[in-house]
Every structure is written in C-alpha cells, then in structure tokens.
Design a protein with these regions (language model features):
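Conserved catalytic core of the tyrosine transesterase superfamily
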Residues: 1-347
Length: 347
C-alpha cells in the first residue's frame, strides 16, 4: 500500500519541525493543530473522507475554499479566525512543498491562490455586560463539585482576563497568595505575565483549592493543575468551551432579553474585563499590560465598543481606531483522536 505522504508530512511537521526547528510556542502549535482537526472534520462531514483517506490530491482549491466558507457559515468563525486557519494550512503547504515536492506542488499552489479575507474595521466584540457577567457567575450549582469548579473557572476567566489555554495550563505553582493575590499566566510566545486578581476572587480560589485538598505550600501539589476535567488532570480548551456554552445557554433561557450576541466563547470573558476596565476609566496602557498584548494597537479595539468609549479614546489619543483579529478556539474533534500529532502537547 502506498504511504499517505500527507499524513506522514503532517506528523513530522507537528512533532519535529514546528517545535524543534521553528521553535514555535505550545499555544501557536495548538492553534495550527486545531486548524487541521477542523479541516479533517470538514472533509468527513461534507465529503465523506475519513482522515486516513485524505491525500494532497484531496485538497483542491475549491475544497479549501469550501472549508474556509464552512468555518464562517457553519462554525460562526469571524473573518479574522478564518484567516488564521488559512495561515496554518499555508504554513504547512510551504513545508510540504520543500519535503514532498512532487506530491505537494499542486496543493501549495491551491493554498497560495487563496487570498486573506478583509476584516471589517472595529468588528463586533462578543463581550458580556456587567449584568450578564453577574448572571453567568450565579448559574452554576455550587452544591456539587462540578458546579464549584465551574463557577471558579468562570470567575477566574473574567477576573484575570486569561485566555482559555492560559487557564488550562495554570498550576498551583503559578498562584501567589499574600496581601495581594497574583497569578502567573503564560501566554502567546511563551511570554509570562503576573496578574493581580480581586480580593473576592482570591478568597474563592483559596476555598476552591481547600475543597480539593490542594495546598500551594505543598511540594507535591505545586505542579498540579488548578482545573481538571472529569477524565483528565490537565483540562483542554474544548472542555472550557463546553463549560462556557453550558452556562451561556442556561443564562439565555432564564433571561432571554439579555445575551443578544449569536455566539459567546471563553474569550468573551477576556473581552468583557477589558471593556469594563475601560468603562471604569482605566487607561489603555494598563489594559494592554493586564491582557499581555504586545502592541497597544491590539488593545485599542475595545475603545470602539460604544460611542462613549470611542469618543473617550479619541479625546485621549487623537487618532482613529485600528482593527485587530481575535482567534476563537474551536471545539474538540473526536474523529482525529487517532492522529496523535494533532493532539500531542509539546513542552
């Protein structure tokens, strides 16, 4: 049987090339893995192709365009997220061209011919109002261990402005209780930042860890993850997504006149704290540091949320707003579970 050069190339690409040759961060590799998990999902659902049957020849220009349209129309991805998925596929195409010239030449050409999609200026930011945050944080049933975990997770998503992956990776070693409680978050490019959380969140965190018999002073507990799923000690992004979706649906059913946006994700909590900080008069420079943005340009998108915030920004800065793409993490794809290179953690 002829070896599937596409799958072999993908395996080398994710297991050796990206982490060892390119030195990409875990978060970037995970993002690229998700792009291919979703591509295989699309090919199975829409084309009837299981992962082991997908070859370079399967990835025609038309099929790739259909995949990108599927991301937007079926999964509700923004143009910015669609572009990120395209970039992941294009990056692999360049690698495959160098290593499998004959097989990958047409595939590379197909990807290269697909332009990035223009993203609208100041596109809609999916954030929660302060009332909506209060409702969601009251949604879990804290009489159960799962409910206690979920309310802590949702509270910390908001209080820390953490990305979903940052919260999944949080260990007891990253928590510093004291006069102020700080947590260490490792973000894009493996860059770490310290974030101070409010006193009420700190008290919740102490009580939560105590309920799980975890002690930040204990050497054996220091490397334990703060949040775990029912099956894994290290929670996945898809699990965080499912938790957020569960309580958004519950809250929408209870308060149908609120939660007007079509979709919300874990990133909505990060957006929310940024908007609420700006509404309370915090400067964009402080918010930039809090969120771990490399450029102030990224942070300025929050000033476009309301006319009042836009006017406040223009008075302070005197220049127009610029847009920024924000990646939304996809759901877990069980069909690709046998492809270990699409789920392997690189540390």
């Amino acid at each position: 049987m002829k070896t599937n050069t596409l799958l072999a190339s993908l395996s080398d690409y994710f297991e050796s090339y990206l982490p060892e040759v390119k030195g990409f961060s875990d978060n970037t590799i995970t993002s690229y893995q998700y792009a291919f998990q979703l591509l295989f999902d699309f090919l199975y659902e829409e084309k009837g192709l299981p992962p082991e049957k997908v070859t370079f020849d399967s990835l025609s220009n038309g099929t790739l365009l259909e995949y990108l349209a599927w991301l937007e129309n079926k999964r509700g991805c923004s143009p910015g997220t669609r572009n990120l998925r395209r970039t992941a596929v294009a990056s692999f195409a360049k690698y495959a061209l160098k290593n499998n010239f004959g097989d990958a030449l047409q595939f590379y050409s197909n990807v290269k011919d697909i332009p990035k999609k223009n993203t609208p200026k100041n596109s809609d930011i999916k954030y929660f109002t302060k009332d909506e945050i209060a409702i969601i944080l009251n949604a879990p049933d804290t009489r159960s261990p799962i409910g206690k975990r979920d309310v802590m997770l949702l509270s910390l998503l908001y209080a820390s402005g953490a990305r979903a992956q940052e919260l999944c990776d949080l260990t007891l070693n990253d928590i510093y209780f004291g006069t102020e409680t700080n947590i260490r978050l490792v973000g894009k490019g493996s860059k770490a930042r310290m974030v101070t959380i409010p006193e009420n969140s700190a008290m919740m965190l102490r009580n939560y860890l105590s309920s799980k018999n975890l002690n930040t002073s204990s050497a054996k507990d220091r490397l334990r993850h703060v949040f775990s799923s029912q099956t894994h000690e290290h929670m996945s992004i898809s699990c965080v997504e499912a938790i957020v979706k569960k309580y958004v649906v519950k809250s929408k059913n209870l308060y149908p006149h609120l939660f007007k946006r079509k979709t919300y994700t874990p990133h909505s909590f990060r957006h929310s704290i940024a908007v609420h900080m700006l509404e309370c008069g915090e400067s964009l420079v402080v918010i930039k540091a809090f969120l771990g943005h490399e450029s102030i340009t990224t942070t300025t998108v929050y000033a476009s949320v309301t006319p009042e915030l836009a006017n406040k920004y223009l008075r302070e800065r005197g220049k127009p707003l610029e847009s920024v793409d924000s990646e939304l993490p996809p759901h877990e794809n069980t069909r690709t579970a046998t492809l270990s290179f699409l789920s392997k953690q690189h540390h």
